[in-house]
Curated annotation (Swiss-Prot):
The keyword Electron transport does not apply. Pathway: Cell wall biogenesis; peptidoglycan biosynthesis. This is D-alanine--D-alanine ligase. Binds 2 magnesium or manganese ions per subunit. Disulfide bonds: none annotated. Its EC number is 6.3.2.4. One of its GO terms (molecular function) is metal ion binding. Keywords: ATP-binding, Cell shape, Cell wall biogenesis/degradation, Cytoplasm, Ligase, Magnesium, Manganese, Metal-binding, Nucleotide-binding, Peptidoglycan synthesis. Belongs to the D-alanine--D-alanine ligase family. GO terms for cellular component: cytosol. Mg(2+) 2 binds at residues 275, 277. Residues 111-308 form the ATP-grasp domain.
Amino acid sequence: MSKTLKESVIAVIYGGRSAEREVSLQSGPLVAEGLRAKGYQVVELDLYGSNAALDPIVQLQSIEFDLAFIALHGGEGEDGRVQALLEMFGKPYTGSSPLACGLAMDKVLTKRFWNGIGIPTPAYLSFVDHANADLIEEQMSYPVIVKPSREGSTIGINKAMNRAELDDALIKALEYDSDILVEEFIDGPEFTVTVIDDVAYPPIGLKPAPDHKLYDYEAKYIADDTEYLLPCGLDEDDENELQMLALDAYRSLGCFGWGRVDVMRDQAGVFWVLEVNTAPGMTSHSLVPMAAKYVGIDYASLVEKIAQNAWDKVGRN
């Protein structure tokens, strides 16, 4: 007879080697605590360990578990490599497939794909191993946003208002990734939409303090002066439009289980999709728990819902 999820062991996998390791080290223990509060058997795994020298295959083989809750952010935990490894081991896991994760993690590939199917996303230029500031100035107008193609949590992202800031932003982005993206700046409010089990939750409006050029790493995880607007401030029709666009962007990449979609709105009222996060943060500052709480789902119930969704998907309930 098949096990129920309550009879199974859930491995919460966090840590990793990416620049988002510190965020993941906050998310993972909170997820484990929430699952234990709901009565689940939980083991915790800091992938690679604190010295990043451990073999992840040996680590995964060293513990007994039935379902993996992926609380890794960025790197191998969000680009599909850990997901592929778990599939080889025959272990179900939370979130999207290796292919969907890999596509969503690469901002350049995502934007090329969206341009092909009509999902509105800001104009951009991309570069590999170098950046041509002269070309950027020829084809784009300031301000621009400079990003590493495959990082999250706004790590390595900077807004450039002039050539000096552009040169500095390009150098910083190349410290994190050989592929970089230079994107048109959308002048307007930013929103984020949580998706769980193919349902778009109420959007959150993001309003960083005036001293932040954009909703950056500090505004996300450190500062206490960022405003989170729930309700988001849109009228019902615009909110519905935003939710449907977020769902379209999420589904187009083949995502499922759960995720978060980041969107800007320009001064003309047009929405522009920035990216899809397939393993969003689950810290005390994170947006997915915030959206869930707004509709009456506490943290422990949220992580239970995500885990149960993954378990049900493989028919083991």
